[in-house]
Design a protein with these regions (language model features):
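Short, gly/Ser/Thr-rich active-site loops of penicillin-recognizing serine hydrolases
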Residues: 24, 306, 337-363
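Short, well-ordered beta-strand elements
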Residues: 310, 318-337
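Short, conserved catalytic-motif segment at the N-terminal edge
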Residues: 25-76, 98-100, 160
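Short, surface-exposed loop or secondary-structure junction motifs
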Residues: 116-315
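Bacterial Sec-dependent N-terminal signal peptides
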Residues: 1-28
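Short, glycine/proline-biased beta-turn/loop segments that scaffold the active-site neighborhood
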Residues: 101-116
Length: 363
């Protein structure tokens, strides 16, 4: 047998092995999803392989009070996954020469009330949570009147004059406040309302027709209410509307599993950013609490392949968007109940990480 023939046969067996391995994973995924019980997980899960949806299932109730079931097109609160969208908007403006990554905030917001932020904090630091700004969602926000947040500027008084937690550029501190500042800059340099900018430059090009910032006093069809037992006197979940406001650049948009898959696909395939800009976004910049961070995106290097995306959590909200960069899987998990561990949204995410990305490496 000649060398060429041997290589052909070897290639065939390698291809068969790869296909069998992929089919085995897909079968395990189906079996796992079939085993999930609405009593433990409420939400929707989408699995795509090579940018083709292979599983898309909904579980549990969108409204406990009215017995309305979650569906494939149910809109869930995505919490901090909004930050990833804000980062893309920022990098689009960088791409167009309207924003510099190492330029201080004051260049774009000369009247921003905090002088240290104006003079010392850069766009790079805002995108990587190294600006020293705090996380307003765990401060005065909880007790505030959520109805008053109509514009990006409405969020600013909660944190603008707070003391920085660290010298800008020296330490990682997860900061919702920093992403609100990015939202202000997006408005200033684009000349558009933040929400309109997203619709025109991200949602429309990506085909995300079911993603919205949601005015609190408006009615949204197919919306899942979130349910939480935090701050309660019993184990009976209560609706979480008290803890939610209109979306800010740091969190709380509503979306569907399919829309977030479309967002992931558009981002990876050059519809939203040039290849060089996407690579800049995806490159690890700093070490976070457990993963590395690019620009507004988590880069998990703890497994046998890179997992990138973002998670989100709040009272009665859990969201995961994960792209497995070697094996080309995309997983979207949206849940409208508190995370309950093994079969909650984070437990479901762990299942996919172990199955697709292999053995966990040391942190």
């Amino acid at each position: 047998m000649n060398i060429k023939r041997k290589l052909q046969i070897s290639s065939i067996f390698l291809l068969i092995g790869i296909l069998t391995f992929g089919q085995s994973k897909d079968a395990e995924i189906k079996s796992f999803l079939d085993s999930l019980q609405p009593s433990n997980f409420s939400g929707a899960i989408l699995v795509a392989h090579n940018d083709k949806i292979i599983e898309n299932k909904a579980f549990g109730l969108a409204s406990i009070e009215y017995g309305i079931e979650n569906k494939l097109d149910t809109k869930f609160n995505i919490a901090s996954i909004t930050k990833m969208i804000t980062a893309v908007a920022t990098l689009q403006l960088f791409e167009n020469g309207k924003i510099g990554l190492n330029v201080p905030v004051g260049e774009y917001l000369p009247n921003y009330p905090n002088k240290l932020v104006r003079d010392l904090v850069t766009i790079h630091q805002l995108l990587t949570h190294t600006s020293g700004n705090n996380n307003f969602y765990v401060g005065n926000y909880l007790q505030s009147d959520k109805m008053k947040y109509k514009t990006i500027s409405d969020f600013v008084p909660m944190f603008a004059n707070d003391t920085l937690l660290s010298k800008p550029g020296t330490k990682y501190n997860y900061s919702a406040s920093g992403f609100v500042i990015l939202g202000l800059i997006i408005e200033k340099v684009s000349g558009q309302n933040y929400y309109d900018y997203l619709k025109e430059n991200i949602f429309r090009p990506a085909g995300m027709i079911n993603t919205t910032e949601l005015e609190i006093d408006s009615v949204l069809q197919n919306k899942a209410s979130g349910y939480t037992t935090f701050f309660g006197e019993s184990d009976i979940p209560k609706r979480n509307e008290y803890y939610l406001s209109k979306a800010s650049p740091a969190g709380f948009h509503y979306s569907t599993v399919e829309d977030l898959f479309k967002f992931s696909k558009a981002l990876r395939n050059g519809k939203l950013l040039k290849k060089s800009t996407a690579e800049l976004m995806f490159g690890p910049k700093v070490k976070g609490y457990s993963t590395n961070l690019g620009y507004g995106i988590d880069i998990d290097l703890r497994y046998n392949q890179t997992i990138q995306g973002h998670s989100g959590g709040w009272y009665g909200v859990r969201a995961e968007l994960m792209d497995f960069m070697k094996d080309n899987y995309t997983i979207v998990i949206l849940s409208n109940i508190d995370d309950n561990g093994k079969t909650g949204a984070s437990g479901v995410a762990d299942f996919f990480k172990e199955l697709i990305a292999g053995k966990r490496n040391k942190d």
